[in-house]
Regions:
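Extracytoplasmic/secretory-pathway proteins
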Residues: 10-14, 21-77, 93-95, 101, ...
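TPR-repeat structural position
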Residues: 87, 126, 162, 206, ...
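Short solvent-exposed coil/turn linkers within tandem alpha-helical repeat scaffolds
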Residues: 65, 98-109, 133-147, 162, ...
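"A position-specific structural signal for the A-helix of alpha-solenoid helical repeats
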Residues: 76, 115, 151, 188-195, ...
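Alpha-helical segment of the N-proximal tetratricopeptide repeat
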Residues: 64-96, 100, 191-205, 281-298
């Protein structure tokens, strides 16, 4: 069996946007991992919001915006209410202008639309406000198209990423963002460059994304996030050196006390993990004709170095141990690889789910012609995971077909609350599949919309029953329905991916058994037999040599916490060569 070689594009997962699929291709759900949460709104602190009313090109080659003429008396009265910050009354009056009740011209209707969105923002109906600002951002001819960019940035501090404000920021260009490059609004300028970079990244415009991320200054609270996306953008264009440099800048900034970071230890570990994955990906080259892998030992060693920097208390530590096991395997360091797997399968981590670790263990035994041991590992693997796979698929069958996203979302909430009627053998697997940060942000978005709906229902009855009140209620209902559908769809894809990967690992186990049978009959493919380890080689690669800081202590069947991560297993080759 030829081991699957992961590349950085496959394994780096920073809870990032899923790049948009190429034309004719379906989008693939992004894995869950660890992008930093949406920043909290900043306090005023003397910052000035400059309203930029002067005209400029919109960058889209569109015709000039409409011009507002003389306001009707009703529109002027609505604007006065707005200026007096009587947001409730202003919203109702402005909505009448927008709907044409007052007979105002298109230009004044657009002005009223803009002021209506601001009024709703001030009333803390952020989703309803965003719905209107979205309409404005979609129309470069709108008289307040440019000014809306400021409010999109404000909304991004109130609504989480699943609201997809980044998509609306993507309607703007460098020149329009550059208008905020002044002493009073530089924080906004950095934030908008980060958001526009995210838009370019999701649309696979990686070089453009990198250029925009590099405009985010070290003083910005978005700096660390911008550097993460700089790194993974370089990974996407297969430039490992600048990718690693971006991740190193994150660690340097954290060491220097950069602002705007809530969980420094987690981000430091994530940066180490990302560097390890990048080095590992670039260390292995596979010949397209022979499918034989060649390894750059320097880069592979660098990958191991950064995996070892992930703290044992980190949520990423087990991931680092498992991924490092493949690197040790590629380097021929089987004692290290098997030792890591021994840690992963210890009783200290009863809820961990690394079925591929058993596959790797069997591959190592097979490579050393220990066919009986390899067969035993595969048999134990099948005995444990085949029933789990069957149960996972049984649940999945209940959510096949159309319009199953909302029912699965309800199932997701039940599981997170400790319910869901799950067998205890699969509960931790399902919980892990449905607990990544991107999915949790979608759940938080639904909760936020429900909280906004509660605020709306506590608003004055006159507002609720007004035409704008009905629009606010409708906007919240639509947004919640879409958010639930999106969260359910994402959860389904996470669950399906776990099932698909487990099926793949079970098939890999069967392939190993086939190769074992062929080897025992001396019919093994030459490519596979050339990859096996001779007895002489096993004396080099299969023994355990402690350094001056460590001693060998035989394992007696009892695990100790302080030994986790330090296990080694002697491997003796049974190959005849």
């Amino acid at each position: 069996m030829v081991p699957r070689i992961a590349r950085a594009q496959d394994v780096i997962d920073l809870d990032s946007d899923t790049p948009a699929p190429k034309k004719g291709a379906k989008g693939k759900a992004a894995k869950g991992g660890a992008a930093p949460a949406t920043a909290a709104p900043k306090k005023a602190g003397g910052k000035v919001d400059i309203d930029l009313d002067e005209d400029s090109g919109n960058g889209g080659g569109a015709q000039a915006p409409v011009v507002a003429g003389q306001m009707t008396e009703a529109a002027a009265s609505a604007k006065q209410l707005f200026d007096k910050e009587k947001w409730n009354e202003a919203a109702q009056a402005l909505h009448r202008v927008v709907t044409g009740e007052t007979g105002d011209d298109p230009g004044n209707k657009q002005l009223a639309e803009y002021f209506l969105a601001i009024s709703l923002y001030r009333l803390k109906f952020y989703q309803a406000s965003y719905a209107i600002f979205s309409v404005i951002a979609d129309n470069p001819n709108h008289v307040k198209f440019k000014e809306t960019l400021l409010w999109l940035a404000k909304l991004a501090t109130q609504l989480p990423e699943p609201a997809d404000i980044i998509e609306r920021v993507g309607k703007y260009n460098d020149e329009q963002v550059g208008r905020f490059d002044n002493d009073q609004q530089r924080d906004l300028y950095w934030q908008l460059n980060y958001m526009l970079g995210r838009y370019k990244y999701r649309n696979r415009q990686y070089e453009e994304a990198i250029r925009l991320f590099q405009k985010v200054d070290r003083r910005s609270e978005y700096y660390v996030k911008a550097q993460f996306f700089t790194g993974i953008s370089y990974v996407q264009v297969r430039k490992s050196v600048p990718a690693v440099q971006a991740f190193q800048r994150i660690q340097k900034a954290l060491d220097e006390g950069v602002e705007g970071v809530e969980d420094e230890d987690r981000l430091r570990d994530l940066a180490s993990l990302s560097m390890a994955r990048t080095y590992y990906s670039s260390s292995i080259k596979t010949d397209p004709e022979s499918n034989q892998a060649t390894v750059d030992s320097t880069k592979l060693s660098a990958a191991v170095k950064y995996w070892n920097q992930v703290d044992a208390a980190s949520e990423y530590w087990l991931d680092a141990l498992f991924e490092e096991s493949w690197a040790y395997f590629m380097a021929g360091d089987y004692p290290h690889a098997l030792g890591n797997i021994h840690t992963l399968q210890s009783p200290y981590f009863p809820n961990s789910f690394y079925p591929e670790a058993s596959v790797l263990k069997a591959v190592i035994y097979f490579s050393n012609c220990n066919y009986e041991a390899a067969t035993t590992v595969v048999a134990q693997f099948n005995k444990k995971y085949t029933p789990i796979k069957d149960q996972l698929e049984k649940i999945l069958k209940n959510y096949k077909g159309e319009n199953k996203e909302e029912p699965f979302f309800k199932f997701l909430l039940e599981v997170r609350a400790g319910g869901g009627n799950l067998d205890e053998r699969i509960r931790p697997i399902v919980e892990n599949a449905l607990s990544d940060r991107q999915l949790l942000r979608n759940i938080d978005y639904v909760k936020l919309l429900e909280e906004e709906d509660k605020r709306f229902k506590k608003s004055p009855p006159t507002f609720q029953s007004s035409s704008i009140g009905q629009q606010v209620g409708d906007a919240l209902k639509l947004a919640r329905d879409l958010a639930v559908r999106q969260a359910g769809e994402l959860a389904l894809s996470r669950y399906q991916r776990n099932v698909d990967e487990l099926n793949e690992h079970l098939r890999d186990g069967e392939k190993i058994l086939i190769d074992i049978t062929a080897a025992q009959r001396n019919l093994l493919d030459e490519k596979l037999s050339n990859g096996q380890v001779s007895k002489a080689e096993s004396k080099i690669f299969g023994i355990v040599k402690p350094d001056e800081e460590h001693v060998i202590w035989p394992f007696d069947g009892e695990y100790w916490r302080d030994e986790l991560g330090f296990y080694r297993q002697v491997v003796e080759s049974a190959c005849g060569r």
